[in-house]
């Protein structure tokens, strides 16, 4: 009986290995011209390009007193980067309007306990109790529109 299981295992492993090799080749082909666009901060992620390809909006942890992501906009020609979100609370899901004059993002900065939550997360991190990444639902997430010319934001969900 062991021989039968061994033969079945061997027979199945060959096609699986071939599929893995093919997937790796496809990935290498698609990712052959990658380059890093952001360097500052502890971590960064979830970036989206403007319709004309000149800018990218992304989330990054860069503020010393805030362990949560904030939203940044980078000019891909100059490298100039500006924070779009207010600097406190959690942020996510940013988007550049196709017209290029406004952006939108979700934020909890209106949460009365936003700064307290930041302090608690920093304390956990200092104690080595940092949580693994997970996307936590937060009832204080609202959607904001930010005008790139006036530098003003407005809450769209309240």
Regions found by a protein language model. Name each.
Residues 5-15:
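Bacterial N-terminal signal peptides
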Residues 39-42, 59-70, 86-91, 106-143, ...:
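A flexible loop/linker signature enriched in serine peptidases of the S9 family
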Residues 25-42, 74-90, 146-158:
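Multi-bladed beta-propeller domains
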